[in-house]
Regions:
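Outer-membrane beta-barrel domain signature, strongest for Gram-negative TonB-dependent receptors
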Residues: 1-80, 194, 203-208
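Extracellular loop and loop/strand-boundary signature of outer-membrane beta-barrel proteins
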Residues: 1, 6-10, 38-49, 89-98, ...
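Membrane-embedded beta-barrel scaffold of Gram-negative outer-membrane proteins
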Residues: 17-36, 152, 159-160, 168, ...
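Surface-exposed extracellular loop regions of Gram-negative outer-membrane beta-barrel proteins
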Residues: 80-87, 131-137, 143, 151-194, ...
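Signature of Gram-negative outer-membrane beta-barrel scaffolds
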Residues: 71-157, 169-170
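Conserved C-terminal beta-signal and adjacent last beta-strands/turns
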Residues: 195, 273-380
Length: 380
């Protein structure tokens, strides 16, 4: 079971021609309850449950003119575990239970500056100052930097390069879920380098290419020996993606992309096949007055891990999923729609038990096969 209740309040105002202000408050309550009986006779039961509350308050101010855009602000966030959990022992040796929590203050500033007609420079700083309860590892404060330089070679060709630091707090489940949580886990941090190029063939067709490399100075992953989350060091991932976007005549549009990923990050699940080594995505849409129809999908190529290459951990390592959609809108307040997902009824999965334990092929979590959805939407 999964239940999420979210409340968001947001206020935006403009002050003159150059200043904007935005205030945001958000509260999200999330409850989950998962149970699995592996052998169908209650001998190998496994389950987890959680109940979290998240509060976020943000205040952002921005200034913009012809050459600059300056954004600065502060965010406050707090996560609280609503379930009493074992937290250790008091000074007298008695067991202690508590509702774990942590909070974070983030202060940031970013400047986008078009300092010459064909040059633009972006730079930013973000300082995080987290605090935890007394039973959780101390999270040290951290300052992240980012910058990017873009150059317009010609009116149709643009190149850019940059670097972005990251600092990611562990989730409440990573810290406190009894089955695999670890209250000693600390935030992940590192940086990503990126280089990109874009070319505009015409006002209707554009090509983009991006290469990236991410280095983890400290990451968070799952340790199969201890069956707990922990921190790892010196992970690296890199890849590229290319995309062609085109408007074909007045009624057709198309988009095709290819992404490639290599990752060597201890404790992640890329080597187990959760993320694709290569992935092709596409869509083609036809629009004519009141009628719209489209075909979209992806082709997935999984990385073969030499360590478990003989284990069939997934239904397929190469597969395509394709979807059709049709919309007819006789008037603005009335719409008929038909969606056919996974039109070839392909067996595929995004999660599996096979690679985590001694389960046999077939103990994966299949995604839906061919599904039909027909409906009518009317606005009053």
């Amino acid at each position: 079971d999964y239940k999420s209740d979210m409340l968001t309040l947001q206020d935006k105002i403009s002050i003159g021609k150059h200043w904007d202000n935005q205030f945001t408050y958000r509260r999200n309550k999330v409850k989950t309850n998962y149970f699995q009986d592996y052998d169908m006779n209650a001998q190998s039961n496994w389950g987890i449950s959680s109940d979290y509350t998240y509060d976020i308050i943000g205040e952002q101010v921005s200034f913009h003119d012809e050459w600059n855009r300056l954004t600065f602000g502060v965010d406050y966030s707090k996560g609280r575990d609503n379930v009493l959990r074992a937290a250790g022992f008091d000074v007298n040796g008695n067991p202690v239970k508590t509702n774990h929590w942590y909070e974070n203050y983030s202060f940031y500033i970013q400047e986008d500056w078009n300092f010459l007609p064909r040059w633009s420079l972006s730079g930013g700083l973000r300082h995080d100052r987290p605090e935890t309860d007394q039973y959780t590892a101390d999270f040290s404060s951290h300052t992240s930097k980012s910058y990017r330089l873009s150059y317009e070679i010609t009116p149709k060709d643009t190149v850019y390069a940059g670097r972005n630091d990251f600092y990611i707090l562990p989730g409440l489940d990573v810290l406190y879920i009894p089955q695999y949580g670890n209250a000693k886990v600390r935030p992940a941090y590192g940086y990503t380098d990126t280089v990109g190029y874009s070319h505009v063939f015409s006002d209707k067709t554009m090509f983009t290419f991006n290469w990236f490399r991410t280095k983890d100075e400290q990451s968070i992953g799952y340790d199969t020996s201890s069956k707990k989350y922990k921190n790892f060091n010196q992970g690296v991932s890199r890849g590229w993606n290319a995309q062609l976007i085109s408007q074909i005549g007045s009624k057709w549009s198309a988009n095709v992309g290819w992404a490639h990923l290599y990752s060597n990050v201890p404790g992640d699940n890329f080597s187990l096949g959760y993320s694709p080594k290569d992935k092709l995505t596409f869509d083609m849409i036809y629009h004519n007055k009141k009628f719209t129809g489209g075909l979209d999908g992806f082709y997935f190529i999984r990385r073969k891990n030499p360590v478990n290459s003989d284990l069939k951990g997934w239904p397929n390592d190469k597969y395509g999923i394709y979807n059709l959609s049709f919309n007819y809108e006789p008037r603005k307040d009335f719409n008929f729609y038909l969606k056919i997902n996974n039109i070839f009824d392909k067996l595929w999965a995004e999660h599996t038990d096979v690679i985590w334990s001694d389960h046999t092929p077939g103990t994966w979590y299949s995604m839906p096969g061919r599904t039909w959805l027909f409906g009518v939407k009317m606005e009053v």
